[in-house]
Amino acid sequence: MRINERVELYKKIYKQSKAIDPVVNLMNKTDWVTGDPFEKLEALRELNTELSDLYQVSIPVITVWVRDDNYVQATGEIYLTEPELESFLHQFRHHLQNIERRYERRGLTSEGAWRDFWRVPYKDCIYRMYGEDDAIAWSKFVIEVAVDK
């Protein structure tokens, strides 16, 4: 399944995503095109806290201005080259995937959808890295739906 097909699928099955409203609020109060990088970083940190509370997960540490965007599973840290919304959402999704590996949190990435959808993020993938298709599509899905709201 291609990424754009996965995004469209997510729009159908993850309509009740907890991430959409906080992202809408963030987009309304922050200038993501020409805004100050430090203001963007502070906005991402607020979003990080809000999403962590909504999903009831630990708050990942955000470090910016590094060489590569990355999520470190062992420490739960998010590294970003720039404070960008899509990059942050992508890495935050990896954080959710990491926490979902615990049995008691199974289904965390299914956004409250039925149990039938628990495996959707990991089926019919293009990328070999576990969860990469899901993280790319989820970040695009959240932004597209937030822009349309």
Regions found by a protein language model. Give the residues of each.
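A metal-dependent hydrolase signature that marks the N-terminal structural subdomain at the beginning
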Residues: 1-74
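Exposed, low-complexity/repetitive linear segments and helix-based recognition motifs
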Residues: 2-5, 79, 129
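Intrinsic disorder/low-complexity segments enriched in polar/small residues
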Residues: 6-12, 74, 98-101, 133, ...
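Metalloprotease/metallohydrolase-associated module, dominated by Zn2+-dependent proteases
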Residues: 32, 39-46, 51, 57-59, ...
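Membrane-embedded and juxtamembrane structural elements of multi-pass membrane proteins
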Residues: 67, 72-73, 80, 95, ...
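Short pre-active-site segment immediately N-terminal to the catalytic Zn-binding motif
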Residues: 74-88
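Active-site recognition of the HExxH zinc-binding catalytic motif
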Residues: 86-99
